[in-house]
Each structure stands twice: as C-alpha cells, then as structure tokens.
From Swiss-Prot:
It comes from Brucella anthropi (strain ATCC 49188 / DSM 6882 / CCUG 24695 / JCM 21032 / LMG 3331 / NBRC 15819 / NCTC 12168 / Alc 37). One of its GO terms (biological process) is tRNA modification. Residues 39-42, 163-167 are annotated as: Interaction with substrate tRNA. This is tRNA dimethylallyltransferase. Catalyzes the transfer of a dimethylallyl group onto the adenine at position 37 in tRNAs that read codons beginning with uridine, leading to the formation of N6-(dimethylallyl)adenosine (i(6)A). CDD domains: NK (cd02019). GO terms for molecular function: ATP binding; tRNA dimethylallyltransferase activity. Belongs to the IPP transferase family. It catalyses: adenosine(37) in tRNA + dimethylallyl diphosphate = N(6)-dimethylallyladenosine(37) in tRNA + diphosphate. The gene is miaA. It comes from the Bacteria. The record marks 105, 127 as: Interaction with substrate tRNA.
Length: 308
C-alpha cells in the first residue's frame, strides 16, 4: 500500500460518449461519494457542451468537482490537476467519503496512481521562446542544438519530432536538468493502486459511433454555436488547449461562412470518433490487468457494487 494514498477510490475510465458520467452518478448514489473530473478538456470554463461536461441535472444529482474551474486562456498541466486533486482530498468534508474519478484522460489516471513522472512547470516566456524558434528554425536544426546541450535526451528523439524536441529544450533551459532526469522521478500516488476499484468502459464500436453522432447533433442544437462565439470573443491564442476542443475549429469555420452546417457537423463527428478510437487504444494498451473492462455501464455497475 502506498503510504498516505486513498484506499477507497473508484476509477472509471473510457473513451468519450461511453457512458462514464452516468455510471459515476449511479456510483455516487450507491456510495454517498463525490465525483472528480479526470478529463483534461472538461476542466475549462465556457465549453460546457463541446467538452460534454455534466449538465445541470447531473450536477444536481451528485456532487461534482474540478469541472470548468480553469479559464480557457490558461494552459493546465497534469501536474496542476494532480495538485488540485490533492487539495480537494485533504478537505475535511471529503474525509471518509468515496472519491469517484471519471474521465477519458489516461495520463490523469496514471498520475493519480503514482505512475507519472513529476514534470516541472516551465516559465511561459521560456515556452514561448522555444516555440518561436521551432517555427523559425525547424525541428532538425533544434534537434542539433539539443544534441549539443542534452545529448542523451536528443538520442531518444527523432529529428522531425518537433513537439518533443521543443519540450526537451524548454525543460532543460527552464530547470537546468535534462528531461530524462525528470522522467525518471516518479510521482507520489494519491490513490492506492491495489485497493482502488478500477473500471474501463470500452463499448461496441458501432454503438459508440452512433452515440457520438447523436450527441454532437444535440450539442449543435442546444447551444454549441453560442459557446464558440463566446470563446472567439476572448481572442485567445489558437495554440491554447481550449481552442483545440473538438468542434471549435469546425464551428468557427461555419460562423465565418467557409463551411456548411452539414460539413461542420460531419467533420466534428469524424474527429470525435477518431479521438474515441485513440482513447480506446490507449486504455487497451496502457492499463494493466487490475482494471476490469466492460462493454456497458450496467455490467460495470454490477461489478462495482459487488466488489468492495
């Protein structure tokens, strides 16, 4: 057992639209517990619909935390999320209650169980500098520069892997240490891996595909366009995570007249299906045998309520 780690947690992972949120609410009723967002996009304010955050009825049905608490103008790291979770779990009102972590971000679950390196926060000006250098000089030139400064890290990266090259350079400059050093420093588990009840929902692909299409059509009809309008008014950097939420680019193109309603919906649905496929692949390949896989939430609920 990890010293100080929560021993009564429930973890519910799965791709978008798989029925995780409804299952979490059922478990909150069953246990008297509270729900904790474990999805990197649902932390952002403004995009209630497009990130499929719990609606008013859901929020009234169970206690939810860490949803929509981050401004879309901010970048929000896994480390920041973990700090927020730690603060939440130490609140007196949360003691002796069951935390139910639900979401689709695999790295959040890994961090929760202590399997993610404690990555440093890099100053914004350092990040901006190296992203600017990448645009000007290209990945091969920066890979050569990384080879001079941090040859061991450079040896692990392909010369065309721009994102990881920039990350390695900014970490080296911002902290004075190689990214390899940080990657070898594992985090402290907040949830005990051995005692937690862990479920991953992996529905039938056809069922999930159809559900994604229906859900996005409802998003469109119920206010997704207004959400994107509100986001665009903020005049944010397109590179910010909130601006990359599925549907933002497509609805923006629709508002600008460069894409029809039908095409915007179709492209958003396709992008969501591709995202769900990537999530499913990650969960299949990265989660160990201690996670119980179910195709539907009813079977998962039955298992969770019979396994204490």
């Amino acid at each position: 057992m990890n010293e100080g780690a929560i021993t009564n947690a429930i973890l519910i992972a799965g791709p978008t639209a798989s029925g995780k949120s409804a299952l979490a609410i059922r478990m909150a009723h069953e246990t008297g517990g509270f729900i904790v967002n474990t999805d990197s996009m649902q932390v952002y304010d403004v995009l209630d619909l497009l990130t499929a955050r719990p609606n008013k009825a859901d929020l009234a049905a169970a206690e939810h935390h860490l949803y929509g608490h981050v401004a879309p103008s901010m970048s929000y790291s896994t480390g920041r999320w973990l700090d927020d979770v730690a603060d939440l779990l130490t609140q007196p009102a949360m003691k002796h209650r069951t935390p139910i972590f639900v979401g689709g971000t695999g790295l959040y679950f890994r961090a929760l169980l202590g399997g993610l390196s404690q990555m440093p926060e890099v100053p914004g000006d350092v990040r901006a500098y190296w992203r600017g250098r990448m645009e000007m000089d290209g990945p091969e030139n920066l890979h050569r520069l990384l080879s001079e400064r941090d040859p061991e890290m450079a040896a692990t990266l392909q010369p065309f892997d721009s994102q990881r090259i920039v990350r390695a350079l900014e970490v080296f400059e911002g902290t004075g240490k190689s990214l390899l050093v940080w990657q070898q420093t594992k985090g402290q588990a907040l949830v005990d891996d051995h005692s937690a009840r862990k479920i991953v929902l992996l529905p039938d692909r056809t069922w999930l595909s159809e559900r994604i299409a229906r859900r996005f059509a409802l998003m469109w009809d119920n206010g997704a366009i207004d959400e994107v309008k509100a986001l665009l008014v903020l005049d944010l950097d397109p590179a910010l995570p909130a601006m990359k939420a599925i549907g933002v680019r497509e609805i923006t193109a629709f508002l600008q007249g460069s894409m029809s309603r039908e095409e915007a919906i179709e492209r958003s649905v396709i992008a969501t299906r591709q995202y769900a496929k990537r999530q499913s692949t990650w969960f299949r390949n990265q989660l160990d045998d201690s996670w119980c896989t179910h195709a539907n939430s009813d079977d998962a609920f039955a298992q969770l309520t019979t396994t204490k």
